Curated annotation (Swiss-Prot):
Keywords: Flavoprotein, FMN, NAD, Oxidoreductase
Protein name: FMN reductase (NADH) RutF
Region called Disordered, residue ranges: 169-201
The reaction(s) this protein catalyses: FMNH2 + NAD(+) = FMN + NADH + 2 H(+)
Disulfide topology: none
Function: Catalyzes the reduction of FMN to FMNH2 which is used to reduce pyrimidine by RutA via the Rut pathway.
Gene source species: Methylorubrum extorquens (strain ATCC 14718 / DSM 1338 / JCM 2805 / NCIMB 9133 / AM1)
EC category name: oxidoreductase
GO terms for biological process, alphabetical: nitrogen utilization; uracil catabolic process
Pfam families: Flavin_Reduct (PF01613)
Length: 201
């Protein structure tokens, strides 16, 4: 046993949350609608698992108000947000009633029955094909059945408990972004909802 192994101690939960706040993540609205009810929450714990077949991973706290509807419906939509979506991200990330959350955006119903935000950067229509409990959360494995990319805004990120924006990369041959536009990505705006990396409303 090495000296570092013998000195190892459990990581404090608060220290872990603080460390995770340093990770910049895309911001998503996870929505569902169906026999289990309509629900949605803001999340950053989303990532790709595979492209063969296309599969996403979504994490949700089992105490989330959206948990029952999401697991009963068995379907969801991952809506990736852009600049200008800070308000709706805050509504879905707090304790706002469901009707007020969905009143903040314009939606269209997908094949699965889930609702897609019409101006999201991209929306993934998904069916939940697997679920695994880890600590306080469930890890959902979601088969992607359709993709719609419509939004043209800069990407919305969440880092150090603040929203930030990341300018879109210029097209090949296009002029570089204006300095002021690039600098804006380094600015921070206070988040309207709770920390997203570890908690879901």
């Amino acid at each position: 046993m090495t000296e570092s192994e013998s000195a190892a101690v459990p990581v404090d939960a608060a220290a872990y949350r603080e460390a995770m706040s340093r990770l910049a993540s895309a911001v998503h609205l996870i929505t569902t609608d169906g026999p289990g009810g309509r629900a949605g929450f803001t999340a950053s714990a989303v990532c790709s698992v595979s492209d063969a077949p296309p599969t996403l991973l979504v994490c949700i706290n089992r105490t989330s108000s959206a948990y029952a509807a999401l697991t009963q419906n068995g379907t969801l939509c991952v809506n990736t947000l852009g600049e200008g979506h800070e308000t709706v991200a805050g509504l879905f990330g707090g304790r706002t009633p469901v009707d007020e959350r969905f009143a903040a955006g314009t939606w269209r119903r997908l094949r699965s029955g889930a609702l897609a935000l019409t101006d999201a950067l991209v929306s993934f229509d998904c069916r939940i094909v697997g679920r695994h409990a880890v600590g306080s959360h469930d890890v959902l494995y979601c088969a992607v059945e359709a993709v719609a990319a419509s939004g043209q805004a800069d990407a919305l990120l969440y880092s150090e408990r603040r929203y930030r924006t990341l300018p879109r990369a210029p097209r090949s041959g296009a002029a570089p972004a204006e300095p002021a536009r690039a600098a804006r990505a380094l600015g921070a705006r206070p988040a309207e909802g709770p920390a997203l990396a570890l908690r879901s409303a």
